[in-house]
């Protein structure tokens, strides 16, 4: 998942960041190119259910800060993945992102669970059989209970243990066209650990250094074991994080990325400061800022012009599946963001792919209330865990089939004035249209 709370905490910092101005490109005319990667994202822990001992099962069991709902069996992807993959195939996507969970693969040090391996083997096989490319995350914020017992990232041994497990997983799935993500949103990973277990500044810095060193080692290992594979680590949110977290982490791994992975959910401008709701976990109260994605993409492309850009996660939460009070639908949100990606492409951004978060609703780090799924699931009240399509299912299918929104599309949500993503251009210049 994503660093939504982290983003909210540093919105003010973003006002001092000045990424490139919005060019007057007009409505998009170019379609997404053939071979563009359209996908859906999820993570193992958040969707699988029936989860072994881990840091996050412990956080859920003890109701750590931010945890309001029991984990239960989540949406039972562990047993329903064959039918869920059919739903993904029906969208027309060609990428399916999930995570190979260390806690499931190695529930005890040195012991690999054959049932877990059989599950992941079949999952990867079925992803490919359904015409999709696997995007596999090696660490989506979850580690085994025995790693927690040894001090997690406070203990230097964890880095070696992590790399040993990663080598095993990469060895197992090499040569299958996997796109590898080492760490999901490393800076948000640190923040989430900080908010769920006691950590002091020294521990935070130790974890930061460990994640940087581990990613760098993993990048080299993956290219040795799986030559030609694409490897990255996705960055949470975008330019509002640059002032703090990019300086602390992203800048230390830019030479070990094959593409720029971006997760974008919301921005802010002087007409829209609703991102403060991220501090309370009420993400559905945030008014989306689709045009902010344009600035984020342009900014990262400017910084790393030799790399293509992939939106690894993007989506919109609703309050337990209820319609937004302002009438802005999941379809509106999806189309508006695709529009701004096409604007960015028209202005030179080398887009590689786009993943929607998520295929189904899932466990959002302590709560089932935020609903992000293209297919909604009542995890707490429906024992059948039925997948019910939202309005965005046919919309995404049409976008993929027609390679974008049509020429002349006008965003439902108009750009705001004085965006945090580009304060110089948007506060002093003309509001984009």
Segments (PLM) and residue ranges:
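A generic structural signal for short
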Residues: 72-73, 111-112, 207, 285, ...
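Acidic/polar N-terminal loop/beta-strand segments that form early-domain functional surfaces
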Residues: 20, 41-43, 99-103
């Amino acid at each position: 998942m994503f660093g939504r709370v982290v983003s909210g905490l540093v919105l003010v910092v973003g006002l001092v960041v000045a990424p490139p101005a919005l060019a007057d490109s007009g409505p998009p005319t170019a379609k997404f190119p053939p071979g563009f990667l359209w996908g859906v994202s999820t993570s193992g822990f958040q969707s699988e259910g029936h989860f072994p001992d881990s840091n996050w099962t412990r956080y859920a069991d003890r109701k750590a800060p931010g945890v309001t709902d029991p984990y239960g069996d989540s949406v039972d992807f562990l047993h329903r993945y064959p039918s869920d993959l059919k739903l993904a195939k029906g969208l027309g996507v060609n990428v399916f992102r999930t995570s190979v969970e260390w806690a499931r693969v190695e529930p005890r040090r040195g012991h690999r669970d054959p049932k877990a391996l059989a599950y992941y083997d079949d999952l990867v096989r079925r992803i490919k059989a359904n015409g999709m490319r696997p995007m596999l995350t090696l660490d989506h914020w979850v580690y085994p209970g025995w790693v927690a017992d040894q001090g997690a990232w406070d203990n230097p041994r964890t880095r070696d243990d992590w790399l040993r497990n990663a080598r095993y997983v990469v060895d197992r799935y090499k040569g299958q066209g996997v796109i590898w993500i080492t760490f999901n949103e490393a800076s948000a990973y640190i923040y989430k650990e900080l908010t769920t277990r006691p950590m002091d500044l020294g521990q935070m810095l130790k974890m930061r250094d460990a994640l940087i060193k581990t990613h760098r080692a993993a990048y080299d290992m993956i290219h040795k074991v799986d030559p030609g594979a694409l490897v990255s680590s996705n960055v949470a949110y975008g330019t509002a994080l640059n002032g703090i977290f990019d300086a602390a982490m992203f800048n230390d791994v830019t030479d070990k990325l094959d593409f720029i992975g971006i997760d974008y959910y919301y921005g802010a401008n002087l007409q829209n400061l609703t991102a403060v709701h991220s501090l309370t976990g009420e993400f559905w109260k945030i008014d989306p800022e689709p045009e902010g994605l344009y600035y984020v993409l342009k900014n990262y492309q400017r910084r790393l012009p030799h790399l293509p850009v992939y939106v690894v996660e993007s989506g919109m939460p609703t309050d337990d599946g209820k319609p937004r009070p302002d009438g802005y639908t999941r379809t509106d949100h999806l189309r508006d963001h695709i529009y701004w990606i096409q604007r960015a492409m028209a202005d030179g951004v080398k887009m590689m792919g786009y993943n929607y978060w998520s295929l189904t609703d899932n466990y959002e780090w302590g709560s089932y209330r935020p609903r992000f799924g293209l297919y909604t699931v009542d995890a707490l009240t429906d024992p059948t865990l039925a997948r019910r399509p939202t309005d965005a299912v046919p919309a995404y299918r049409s976008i993929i089939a027609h390679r974008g929104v049509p020429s002349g599309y006008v965003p439902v949500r108009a750009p705001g004035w004085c965006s945090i993503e580009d304060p110089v251009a948007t506060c002093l210049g003309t509001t984009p249209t």
